[in-house]
Each structure stands twice: as structure tokens, then as C-alpha cells.
Amino acid sequence: MNREGAPGKSPEEMYIQQKVRVLLMLRKMGSNLTANEEEFLRTYAGVVNSQLSQLPQHSIDQGAEDVVMAFSRSETEDRRQ
């Protein structure tokens, strides 16, 4: 298994995808993103749209720790595929 990244994706593409996921999770948990972070999400709107459908569907009331754990499980499953 190649832990460096997904087949067919450059390290830069993987970085962008992971950063988008983290920013979306932070936003979903109620964090205020900086202007630079919001601009990053606007710049990579296509990646944002694909990642939104992959985010765990958990209530914000569930608590940040539970949401982060669900995100971690999702990341692990993505790497196995």
C-alpha cells in the first residue's frame, strides 16, 4: 500500500483535498474561518463540492470530538480504497 497518496493524484492535489476537508469540518463544527481560509475554499470550489458529499452526516450538537473521530474514520476508509 502506498501511504504517500492516492494513485493518480499528485501530492499537491492530495494537500488541497485534505485542506478543503479540514476547513469544511471546522466550518461545520461552528468555527469561524479566516478570510484566507474562505478565499481558499472559493478558489477550490470544485474540490469543495466533491468533499461536501463525502463529509460525515452528523449533527453539530454531537460534539466536536465525535465529529472529528467520524472524520478520522472516513479518512482511514478513503485510504483503504
Swiss-Prot record:
| Any matching Pfam family | ICAT
Q: Which residues carry this modification: Phosphoserine?
A: S59
Q: Which family does it belong to?
A: Belongs to the CTNNBIP1 family.
Function of the molecule:
Prevents the interaction between CTNNB1 and TCF family members, and acts as a negative regulator of the Wnt signaling pathway.
The species this protein was found in: Bos taurus (Bovine)
The superkingdom of the source organism is Eukaryota
Query: What's the protein called, per UniProt?
Result: Beta-catenin-interacting protein 1
Gene Ontology CC terms, in alphabetical order: beta-catenin destruction complex; beta-catenin-ICAT complex; cytosol; nucleus
Does the entry annotate any disulfide bonds, and if so which pairs? Answer: none
**Which SUPFAM superfamilies does this entry report, sorted A to Z?**
beta-catenin-interacting protein ICAT (SSF81730)
Give the GO terms filed under biological process for this record. Answer: anterior/posterior pattern specification; branching involved in ureteric bud morphogenesis; negative regulation of canonical Wnt signaling pathway; negative regulation of mesenchymal cell proliferation; negative regulation of protein-containing complex assembly; negative regulation of smooth muscle cell proliferation; negative regulation of transcription initiation by RNA polymerase II; negative regulation of Wnt signaling pathway
Q: Which GO terms describe its molecular function?
A: armadillo repeat domain binding; beta-catenin binding; transcription coactivator binding; transcription regulator inhibitor activity
Keywords, ordered alphabetically: Cytoplasm, Nucleus, Phosphoprotein, Wnt signaling pathway
Q: How does it assemble?
A: Binds CTNNB1.
Coiled-coil regions in this chain? none
Q: Where in the cell is it found?
A: Cytoplasm; Nucleus
Q: Say if the entry is tagged with keyword Transferase.
A: no
Family annotation (InterPro entries): ICAT_dom (IPR009428), ICAT_sf (IPR036911)
